[in-house]
Regions:
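Conserved catalytic alpha/beta core of Sir2/sirtuin-type deacylases, generalized to analogous enzyme cores
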Residues: 1-254
Length: 254
């Protein structure tokens, strides 16, 4: 979803290295860079990657596709819930209510203690200056409770210290939403969900299997295949949403 806003595509080493050539020179993949051990052994290096991403996400303006989704919701007075594996906070930035979003891998805009010393999760208001040549942070955010290193509240690779409480609360809200709408007709619009980390694809397919009145629409430029009667649209997020919007406009005679 974020690629059409100008955010990098981390799928595959080449896409990651195009966005972060420093890691290509070091021979580090996305999984290598997104390893929580960096915060323990070399926090300036760990925060170099996540500090740069924090700054990038703060500066990024959500694309028109977010507005199209909002228009559909408003026009139809529709109930909705967003499930995302993105950690960039773009849905909140586009104006979607935080209590209607499930961030399955957490959010870069929230922090926790590296140990962790407690179960608190707090907003990330840190200003993180990063040396782009070395991808090392010039300052290290600290835990306000124990003065140890803090880290993003994101589920990383090989991560045993991530605090899931915030995501668990969102998951509970999503389950309540599904129970409330168990007999309703539901459209699941899955956008840009890959197979390497299939969390979102598995969720939409499970909903499509388990609920009789569900249509799943998969928008994906590469991995777009889906079993009938569900629908695939082989293109990027913005183009796919625009296609659906034009179709709905034609159906309504607008």
């Amino acid at each position: 979803m974020g690629v059409d806003s100008g955010l990098p595509d981390f799928r595959g080493d080449q896409g990651f290295w195009k966005a972060y050539p420093m890691y290509a020179r070091l021979g580090l993949s996305f999984a290598d860079a997104a390893n929580p051990q960096h915060f323990e052994h070399d926090p300036a290096f760990g925060w170099g990657f996540y500090g740069h991403r924090t700054n990038l996400y703060r500066e990024t303006v959500p694309h028109e596709g977010f507005h199209i989704l909002q228009q559909w919701i408003s026009r139809n007075a529709a109930e909705f819930f967003i499930i995302t594996s993105n950690v960039d906070g773009q849905f909140q930035k586009a104006g979607f209510s935080d209590d209607r979003i499930l961030e399955v891998h957490g959010s870069i805009h929230h922090l926790q203690c590296i140990k962790p010393c407690c179960h608190d999760i707090w907003p990330n208001h840190e200003e993180i200056d990063v040396d782009l040549a070395s991808m090392r942070a010039r300052s290290i955010p600290l835990c306000p409770y124990c003065n140890n290193i803090s880290r993003p509240n994101i589920l990383m690779f090989g991560d045993w210290s991530w605090l899931p409480e915030r995501t668990n609360s969102q998951e509970s809200a999503f389950q309540t939403f599904m129970e409330r709408n168990s007999s309703s007709r539901i459209a699941v619009i899955e956008i840009g969900a890959g197979t390497a980390i299939p969390t979102i694809r598995a969720t939409s397919e499970r909903i499509g299997r388990n609920h009789a009145k569900v249509a799943v629409i998969r928008i994906n430029p590469r991995e777009f295949q889906i079993q009938p009667p569900h629908i695939s649209i082989p293109c990027g997020a913005l183009e796919g949403l625009q296609q659906i919007d034009r179709y709905l406009g034609n159906m309504s005679g607008k």
